[in-house]
UniProtKB/Swiss-Prot annotation:
General function of this protein: N-acetyltransferase involved in a deamination-independent D-glutamate degradation pathway, named the DgcN-DgcA pathway. Catalyzes the transfer of the acetyl moiety from acetyl-CoA to D-glutamate to generate N-acetyl-D-glutamate.
Record annotation: effect of changing residue 119 to A: Small decrease in activity
Stated name of the protein: D-glutamate N-acetyltransferase
Protein's UniProt keywords contain Transferase: yes
InterPro entries on file: DgcN-like (IPR011669), DgcN-like_C (IPR035086), DgcN-like_N (IPR035402), P-loop_NTPase (IPR027417)
Swiss-Prot/TrEMBL keywords: Transferase
Effect of residue 125 to A: Loss of activity
NCBIfam families, sorted: DgcN
Pathway the protein contributes to: Amino-acid degradation
Length: 333
């Protein structure tokens, strides 16, 4: 059990996208976020109080959460100075990085000496089965994106919150470190051995009531040459009844891949749906979620209207305008 509240460590994140773990906690569990701590040159700012370790401890923070999802998940020497000091100040540490806290000898030694706990949420805690493709009861909705970090998690969380408010049976199913830190449960999909990834999603979304919806957090993109494998596992293992297409319209290239263009929503539709229908022949695309954070209000509304007219599906920014219309669309499934 990870003790709350948290002090969110931003490190030397180059931009806000790199701090998506911290952003997710701030937005969906604000009562868990006491403040932030960053290194010189950090390009991310959550708008929380910038604190020293001593100030955060005095404010009641229990765990220092590494809020940065950097490429490769490595723990730098600059970070370690802060992490060691945090342990010495009485903080537990929590991380979703691929480089595990427990595998860093200096951190492990200090944690043992101080009696603190190292939480690696990207470590699978279950021996997952190989997927068998057997149809399960209940309903499932999966968010798929044109790229990484376009709002797939936010879409699923917003839809789950809206459904809970309406009294509709639903569960957000976390598949990445941010979602796991928000909800306290889930599958760290990109740390699961490849042959068992689809099976882990079957495990995460078991038989349920016929009127219950699993809102499955999407990962990666079918079009991203680095991370498409996890997306395929979700598309097949999740057996979705409904897909939500997710897009960020101001991207000039794929995240971390400057030589690769971002696909259109039409391309995503035409690739994702046949793949999903391989596992569930009745799967439908029911709506579009657009991350309009870099657009002004009028520009965002105009863009959503254009997309809706072009695609023939409800198009919304669930964070900006709510997820009501996306939830309405599920009623027809």
């Amino acid at each position: 059990m990870i003790e709350t509240p948290y002090l969110l460590f931003l490190g030397d994140a180059p931009d806000m996208l790199a701090a998506k773990v911290a952003i997710g906690i701030r937005d969906w569990r604000p009562d868990h976020a006491v403040g932030q701590i960053s290194l010189p040159g950090c390009g991310a700012n959550l708008g929380l109080t910038e604190m020293t370790l001593e100030e955060a401890k005095a404010a009641g923070a229990k765990t220092l959460v590494i809020g940065v999802a950097n490429r490769g998940g490595k723990i730098s020497q600059e970070w370690k100075k802060v992490l060691v000091q945090a342990l010495e100040e009485g903080f537990d540490l929590a991380s979703g990085l691929h480089n595990l806290l427990r595998d860093e000898p200096d951190l492990a030694a200090v944690a043992e000496a101080t009696g603190r706990t190292l939480h690696d949420v990207r470590v699978p805690s279950v021996q997952y089965p190989i997927a068998d493709g057997v149809k399960r009861r209940g309903k499932r909705c999966l968010a798929v994106g044109t790229d990484c970090s376009v709002g797939k998690m936010y879409t699923a969380l917003a839809m789950d919150a809206e459904m809970q408010a309406r009294g509709i049976k639903s569960t957000f199913r976390a598949t990445g470190q941010t979602g796991i830190l928000i909800t306290g449960d889930g599958v760290p999909l990109d740390a699961v051995i490849a042959d068992f990834m689809a099976g882990s999603i079957e495990y995460l979304t078991p038989d349920n009531d016929d009127d219950h919806w699993d809102l499955i957090e999407g990962q990666g993109s079918l079009f991203h040459v680095s991370y498409s494998g996890v997306t395929m596992a979700l598309v097949h293992g999740g057996q979705p009844d409904a897909l939500i297409l997710c897009h960020e319209p101001t991207r000039t290239h794929m995240r971390g891949l400057p030589d690769y263009d971002v696909p259109s929503l039409e391309e995503l539709r035409d690739v994702a749906l046949p793949l999903a229908q391989r596992a569930n022949k009745d799967c439908k695309i029911v709506g579009i979620s657009v991350n309009t954070q870099h657009l002004g209000e009028e520009e965002a509304v105009a863009y959503l209207k254009e997309v809706e007219g072009r695609m023939g599906l409800p198009a919304v920014d669930p964070y900006r305008h709510g997820a009501g219309r996306l939830v309405d669309a599920l009623a027809a499934v």
